[in-house]
């Protein structure tokens, strides 16, 4: 049988589909999520239901967001899951999680085996809804999880790290080998838990400033701050904040990036003509 066919469904490469089939890993993920009746649980990309079924067994109802119309149709007619599911056949990148949380009257518990080809932009989409989310559990490419949990000074530390750790407490849960999937991906995977802060430890006054600074600093990560952010902060301003201008983007802590963002918000740059 073609290695891309699983349970009669042909894995669509353009959707980044790899289906989880390792029962030990499935049980470990479900136990980590620990779904409870009465909670507003949302799965992104349920696929063939490897996680949907065991999670759904513990719930009276749940919401799924599935782009693939064939998979959405399969879930709709699932013998015991079907009646429990509210299915949105759409791209999670366009899904309004705040509207769903408002409808449910409580913050959402979101989980999923995310398609690796869109995992990073999808994480940024979800960060814009953290006020509507209680927690998130995701299977991701191990390299992405390493970036989420990285500390300053490591090669994995980047813009995704800073933004994720600004919004959430990030906790690695378990590693998942390629053979746990059909078809087996060429990379290792891992599960991560993200718990949005009720109040960020280092609040910023305008998130757009933090987004801009991290984009520009890590866009030139081999340059020193004097060069990558020199158009925004003078050496003297950096010194006032006890930030060494000879350091690179990967050496600056989340707290320091937040400090820079608040300074920039308080000292708006003149508009260019």
UniProtKB/Swiss-Prot annotation:
Keyword terms, alphabetized: Cytoplasm, Methyltransferase, RNA-binding, rRNA processing, S-adenosyl-L-methionine, Transferase
Record's catalysed reaction(s): adenosine(1518)/adenosine(1519) in 16S rRNA + 4 S-adenosyl-L-methionine = N(6)-dimethyladenosine(1518)/N(6)-dimethyladenosine(1519) in 16S rRNA + 4 S-adenosyl-L-homocysteine + 4 H(+)
Keyword Lipoprotein part of the UniProt annotation: no
InterPro entries in the record: KsgA/Erm, rRNA_Ade_diMease-like_C, rRNA_Ade_Mease_Trfase_CS, rRNA_Ade_methylase_Trfase_N, rRNA_adenine_dimethylase, SAM-dependent_MTases_sf
Positions contributing to S-adenosyl-L-methionine binding: 18, 20, 45, 66, 91, 113
Single Gene Ontology MF annotation: 16S rRNA (adenine(1518)-N(6)/adenine(1519)-N(6))-dimethyltransferase activity
SUPFAM superfamilies to which the protein is assigned, alphabetical: S-adenosyl-L-methionine-dependent methyltransferases
Domain of life of the native organism: Bacteria
The EC number(s) this enzyme carries: 2.1.1.182
GO cellular component, as recorded: cytosol
Subcellular location as annotated: Cytoplasm
Family per record: Belongs to the class I-like SAM-binding methyltransferase superfamily. rRNA adenine N(6)-methyltransferase family. RsmA subfamily.
Role played: Specifically dimethylates two adjacent adenosines (A1518 and A1519) in the loop of a conserved hairpin near the 3'-end of 16S rRNA in the 30S particle. May play a critical role in biogenesis of 30S subunits.
Protein's name in the database: Ribosomal RNA small subunit methyltransferase A
